[in-house]
Amino acid sequence: MLKNIHNFELYRYQILPINRAQLELFKNTEKSIEELLEKKNHYFIEAFNHLCSNSYLDDIGGIKKLIFKRIYPKEDFLSEDVNIFLMAKPKSLTMETDDFSSKEIQNWPRIHLIVINDKEKQILAVEKRTSAFPSTKNVIRKISERLNNILGLNNLNVHINPIYDKQVFWDFIADKSIKKIEFSLITPNMANISKALSDELKNMAKTSNTARTDIRLNAADGTSLIIERDNSYINDLVEYGSQGGGTIRVQTEGVRKFTDINKGITTMSCDSLTLESNNPKNIIDIINYILGEK
């Protein structure tokens, strides 16, 4: 069998409660936020399964329908750290026939979505295939909206951000006059990446029911920000953001627009035999190696 290579970009998802104080407003059976957070990954995959079983109903704002299919594990009730889905949307093609006429057909180019649902990893690998979707960020916007419509019923919301090398930030600001930096950080609930943030920042976000914390650094008129690698506070914010914890935007001298630093998303490749096997768990090893995680 010919092995096709599929290329992916890596994102981190974090699942947060919408309201930490009033569980009774939702349909939850959980008695506390702690109980809800313990089951958040179950609800996340349940939301994906709902998309698969209800694709025929998909309709958001009159836009084109999306369809989803689960390919691993085969049974919905199985709980696995690796979950693989297909996602497709229709495109109209014009075919010229042998009687010199034309007819419209529906083409459904698809991509793979790999979900690593370990609560200490929470990775979403999105296949890059421009014939199906213009970018992986476009895919993230579409699935985030649909997943949150479902998760919201259980007082949950998912935030999905790209993973990239923090060196991208330092390379970008090198030898530039920096006027503003904006950090937009998701309230952390994953120990392995939130260790970069101070306890004060984490506690403030959680106790105030904050989903996203915005930190803005603005230089005074006629001056520039001083951003050094040995500034542990800045380093921690960059570290957390680059691991999928949020977004970073930078404005340089003489440029009106901000530059998004979360470009150059971390990539991985996987062959079709691995994706379609009965035990694709070595995908976790591939991702761990790329991200330098255990």
Where are these regions (language model features)?
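Long, hydrophobic/aromatic-enriched structural stretches that serve as scaffold segments
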Residues: 72-127, 132
